[in-house]
Structures are given as C-alpha cells and as structure tokens.
Amino acid sequence: MRTVLDAEAVQALLAHSHRAHREVRARLEIGRRLGASAVVPTVALAELYRGRDRSGALDALLARERRALVLRDTDRALARLVGGVLQAAGAGSEDLVDAHAIAVAAEDDRAVVLTGDPGDLERLAAPYPGVTVVALS
C-alpha cells in the first residue's frame, strides 16, 4: 500500500505548528511499520516553493526525510495517467496538481492520499476504487 501526500500534507510536515503536523507524522510512521511507501508527486512541490526561506525549509525537510519520502517525477507514463484522471472526472487543467496525486496513487493497487482538500480529490479519485482520499483534520 502506498501513501501519497499532496501539497497540504507536505506543508503539515514542514510546519510544526500546522494543525495536521502530528497526524501526518503518525500516518507516515504507521505506513513505515507496514512497509508502505510515502510518495510526493514532485509537481506538488511547486505549490510550496515560495521564497528563499520557505524553499530552503522545504529542501531541508526533503533531505532529512529522503528515506521516508519518495519523490515521483512526471514521466510520460504518469502524464498519460494524469490526463486520464482529468478526462474521467471531466476536469480541466486547474486540477492538474490534484490529478497528479490521484494518478500517483492509482499506480498502486491500493493507496491512500492525504490531503487538506478532500472534495476535489474525491471527485478525481471516484473512478479508482483502490484509491482512498483521507482528509487531514
């Protein structure tokens, strides 16, 4: 099983004061114990790279968590799957980053997507029964 983090879930890891920081940490630890990978679509990082301080903090987090977090670049196969996610949901390019999270999840038989935006992701995930969207509290 795979756990996919969207930008909000990565932001929760980044900021100790974030309301979902402990929740994301706990879910990653449970996943690690079960042998599940934690994956971040690299396109989601574009939503987080903002200014030198914040970008530096994000790079430090990714370096510190390099064994826990797998970055998934968009290759041609993933791009094709993302297009399929958008098409199946009747969505446009405004949902491109969210569609990447669902597509990365759909690459595995069973996956969980951690998100602060469950509405859009649930709509995109509807055609994929093995993908479960979990809202951060």
Annotate each PLM feature.
Residues R22-V24, S37-V40, R67, G90, ...:
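A generic "structured core" feature
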Residues V70-P118:
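Active-site neighborhoods of divalent-metal-dependent phosphate/nucleic-acid chemistry enzymes
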Residues R2, D108-S137:
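Acidic, PIN/NYN-like endoribonuclease modules and their adjacent C-terminal/linker elements
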Residues L61-L69, S137:
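Structural recognition of alpha->loop->beta junctions
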Residues E47, A57, L81, R123-L124:
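Phosphate- and divalent-cation-binding pockets in alpha/beta enzyme and binding domains
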Residues E8-A9, V43, A77, G119:
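Alpha-helix/helix-capping structural signal
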Residues P41-V43, R72-T74, G116, V134-S137:
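Conserved beta-strand termini and adjacent loop/short-helix elements that scaffold enzyme active sites
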Residues M1-V39, R50-R64, Y128:
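Short, well-structured N-terminal submotif of metal-dependent ribonuclease cores
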